[in-house]
Amino acid sequence: MNHSPQSARPVSIMRRFLDSEAAGGITLMAAAALALIVANSPFAQTYFDALHLYIGPLSLAHWINDALMAKFFLLVGLEIKREMLDGQLASWPNRMLPGIAAAGGVILPAIIFAVLNHDNPAKLRGWAVPSATDIAFALGVLSLLGSRAPSSLKVFLATLAILDDLAAVVIIAIFYTAEISMPYLGAAFITAAVLFVMNRMGVVKLLPYLISAVILWFFVFNSGVHATVAGVVAALMIPLKPAPGRPDDMTSPLHKLEHTLAKPVAFIVVPIFGFANAGISFKGLEASVLGDTLTLGILLGLFLGKQFGVFGAAWLAIKTGLAEKPMGASWVQLYGVAILCGIGFTMSIFIGLLSFPSDLMQTETKIGVLSGSALSAICGYLLLRAAARPKRG
């Protein structure tokens, strides 16, 4: 009996994807912990000096945040396109629950942050910081439960996080754009148009797309729009099918590039970003920072806003018949996953760096993100572990 690649793909691809994300999450946790240790050790000055070392026109920190992270956003774009066209988000019924839950998880944290910081325009720029979910961290924590967590919950969390990433990309493009240079922006549009034409003409070799993506990054970087947006735009132009008229399979340009990028991004790019940006020196840091509305807005937005926003929106969608509850999952388990959505880290810190130019505000942002993410990870894991425990008697 013959099985098409289409029928064999979902289980094997999702398992491999989840395994990679889980391992990547653990690597990211280790990188963040190491950054905190180094930033409070005798090597702290060397660590901070290295990040501010200029290599060509940019500092090392900027190369990491603007250039290296473009690969992360390229992978995010590939995942979004694959899931929307040929994956868990390919049909409206499948999109409803994670889509509605993701919307709740973006809106409520932003409201909590805005309520606490409404009287300070400088701080209010960070309203989007607690609205993100770190897919590697969250899936890494969920994977610690093994088979005790239904696979439907893992699919729900993965698809919700992908939609969360999509929302974050849109937010970055719209709200965190500097002064626009029209010549560079025009050149970026022309380059994107070239990518689109190549896609429509049936070009399936990756090299022309990758060369055009680098050119697009250069123009977007100089246009004032954040350069990482170039990674997502380029990803959306990569063909999903191996050739015009043929069905999607693992030989398609998109699948090949996604497979090539997955491990380097999970084990090199994101951990380097974590190591470069999670380092907080507690030397001379006043206790009042912990009670500052910026720190509290992010902490409470991630820990409370995310869980109530995601679970509340999901509960409403299920109860009104707009969506179905993940198969085999209890309400308690769904709530546990909603808590895990408060693990913001990568995207939250990234948006924080775009929001605040001052070192103090960036430090407060990182403290809020790290503490909110840690609380969400610990509480979500403990609740899910308790919910999976077999009943006695």
Swiss-Prot record:
GO terms for cellular component: plasma membrane. The chain crosses the membrane at residues 23-43, 58-78, 96-116, 126-146, 155-175, 178-198, 201-221, 224-244, 265-285, 298-318, 334-354, 367-387. It catalyses: Na(+)(in) + 2 H(+)(out) = Na(+)(out) + 2 H(+)(in). GO terms for molecular function: sodium:proton antiporter activity. InterPro entries: Na/H_antiporter_dom_sf (IPR023171), NhaA (IPR004670). It holds the Pfam family Na_H_antiport_1. It is a multi-pass membrane protein. Keywords: Antiport, Cell inner membrane, Cell membrane, Ion transport, Membrane, Sodium, Sodium transport, Transmembrane, Transmembrane helix, Transport. It is found in: Cell inner membrane. GO terms for biological process: regulation of pH. Signal peptide: none annotated. Its main location: membrane. HAMAP family: NhaA (MF_01844). Na(+)/H(+) antiporter that extrudes sodium in exchange for external protons. Belongs to the NhaA Na(+)/H(+) (TC 2.A.33) antiporter family. This is Na(+)/H(+) antiporter NhaA. The lineage of its organism: Bacteria, Pseudomonadati, Pseudomonadota, Alphaproteobacteria, Hyphomicrobiales. The gene is nhaA.
